[in-house]
Amino acid sequence: MVRIRLTRMGKKKQPFYRIVVVDQKKKRDGAYVESLGYYNPLKEPYEVKVDIDRAVEWMLKGAQPSETVSKLLGKLGLYEKLEEAKSKKA
C-alpha cells in the first residue's frame, strides 16, 4: 500500500519533515516515490507547504495519509478539494 507520510530531515534537535509518498513497507527515512512538500514544527507558527493538487491526485489513486499528515492536510483544506475532485470524476 502507498502512504503519504513524514520523513525526518534536519540535524540533531532541529528536525523538519518532508511530506512524501512512499511504500508502506519502506523505512521512515527510506527511498520515496515523490515529495509533496514539507513541515517545519520549529517555526512559530509552524510552517507547512504542500502541493495540494498532487496530494489529491495520489489520494484518488489510493494513497492513505498517516495520522499526522492527515491532520496537517485537513488544516490546509485538502479534504474539501478531494470531495470536489471525486464529484467531478463521478
UniProtKB/Swiss-Prot annotation:
The keyword Cell inner membrane does not apply. Signal peptide: none annotated. One of its GO terms (cellular component) is cytoplasm. Keywords: Ribonucleoprotein, Ribosomal protein. PANTHER family: 30S RIBOSOMAL PROTEIN S16, SMALL RIBOSOMAL SUBUNIT PROTEIN BS16M. Belongs to the bacterial ribosomal protein bS16 family. This is Small ribosomal subunit protein bS16. It comes from Fervidobacterium nodosum (strain ATCC 35602 / DSM 5306 / Rt17-B1).
